[in-house]
Swiss-Prot record:
Keywords: ATP-binding, Cytoplasm, Disulfide bond, Nucleotide-binding, RNA-binding, Transferase, tRNA processing, tRNA-binding. Signal peptide: none annotated. GO terms for biological process: tRNA wobble position uridine thiolation. The active site is at C101, C198. Residues 148-150, 310-311 are annotated as: Interaction with tRNA. HAMAP family: tRNA_thiouridyl_MnmA. GO terms for cellular component: cytoplasm. It is found in: Cytoplasm. The keyword Transport does not apply. This is tRNA-specific 2-thiouridylase MnmA. ATP binds at A10, I11, S12, G13, G14, V15, D16, S17, M36, G126. Residues 96-98 are annotated as: Interaction with target base in tRNA.
Length: 368
């Protein structure tokens, strides 16, 4: 008699991981859940949704009929994710902690814990992505439900890690996930999807970040070098942002809103310009560092592919030119708006995610 394959699923207390767990058990795997605690509520004014999510996870595992384990990765999260998050904000970048969390916590610490400590054959998550064997390696592909596709957030893992992963809902629509959860009467069937940064929860970002970084107010200048306001601290703004600038109407040259187009870290200046498609927002190329190729084969020659420089963005055609093993230049066939250093550029060939890296710098339309 063949022994059942053991799968440890990351149970978050949400509908996606709940239905994923049900699919796995229905498919005949020996399934156990792990609820990861990645954040310690040191400051009582900062409430994460940990307790509510844990309770929902425990109830849903009981409904499905699987055991649940609680594993604390908060120390690893602090050192490998949150410290980097703070460091990047401090120097004016716009980091993405969810990508770091997937890279360092879910698909490294959790994966190793499940395989070594729990003798699992695989781990599973409720991510909307697909894993397909391609050229003899496990590769990452966009989800069937493109509106929910999360391959952008998983591009930092590699084919070896992918080979140990199962994504049960990558081939179905989100609406069907909700439908299945409702038919099973799972407690999470009507639970809202989590949004924003996990350790902030429903709290205001500005209030949260003040607990860790000091405000450093400064001046706002237009691209014409005219002082037109003050800012609360560069860490509160990102390239392409239009809300929260509070620029007085007397400084408007037209009806177009003001947008953040640059940060002068050395002088603590915030630079703004009017119009969504103004040349100070439009980039023709970018430099990427810490590039990860999922198949772990480094580029030797330029390739033409599609790229996203932020999650909710249509991919655009580009030419990728290798500089060294971890650095590349990306030339856009058409200029794109609001590229933010510190964010990630992620590359695709059709629906296959090739990998990506951190945006170090950009070349604007106006640059010679």
């Amino acid at each position: 008699m063949n022994k059942k394959k053991k799968v440890i699923i990351a149970i978050s207390g949400g509908v996606d991981s709940s239905v994923s767990a049900w699919f796995l058990k229905k498919s005949g795997y020996h399934v156990e859940g792990v609820f990861m605690k990645n954040w310690e509520e040191i400051n009582s004014s900062i409430k994460c949704t940990f307790k509510k999510d844990l309770k929902d996870a425990q109830i849903v595992c009981d409904q499905i009929g699987i055991n649940i384990n609680i594993v604390n990765f908060s120390e690893q999260y602090w050192n490998k994710v949150f410290k980097i998050f703070l460091r990047e904000y401090k120097i004016g970048n716009t980091p993405n902690p969810d990508i770091l969390c997937n890279k360092e916590i879910k698909f490294k610490y959790f994966l190793n814990f499940a395989i070594k400590e729990m003798q699992a054959d695989y781990i599973a998550t409720g991510h909307y992505v697909r894993k397909i064997n391609f050229n003899g390696k496990s590769q990452l592909f966009s989800a069937f439900d493109l509106k929910k596709d999360q391959s952008y957030f998983l591009h930092q893992i590699n084919y070896k890690e992918l080979s140990k992963c199962i994504f049960p809902i990558g081939n179905i629509l989100k609406s069907k996930v909700r439908y299945i959860a409702s038919k099973l009467n799972l407690i999470t069937s009507k639970k809202r999807d989590s949004t924003g940064i996990c350790f902030i929860g429903n709290k205001n970002f500005n209030k949260f970040i003040k607990n860790y970084l000091h405000d450093d107010p400064g001046l706002i200048f237009s691209t014409e070098k005219k002082q037109i306001g003050t800012h609360k601290g560069l860490m509160y703004y990102t390239i392409g942002q239009r809300k929260g600038l509070n620029i007085k109407k007397i400084y408007y040259n037209c009806h177009d809103p003001w947008y953040v187009v640059d940060k002068k870290i050395d002088k603590n200046y915030l630079i703004v310009s009017q119009g969504k498609n103004n040349p100070y927002l439009m980039s023709t190329s970018i430099i990427i560092i810490e590039t990860n190729w999922i198949d772990q084969i480094y580029l030797k020659n330029p390739i033409k592919c599609m790229v996203k420089t932020r999650y909710r963005q249509n991919s655009t055609l580009c030419l990728v030119i290798p500089i060294d093993k971890k650095s590349i230049e990306v030339i856009f066939y058409k200029p794109i708006s609001s590229v933010a250093p510190g964010q990630y550029a992620v590359f695709y060939l059709l629906d296959r995610c090739l990998g990506g890296g951190i945006i170090k710098s950009r070349k604007l339309v106006i640059d010679k």
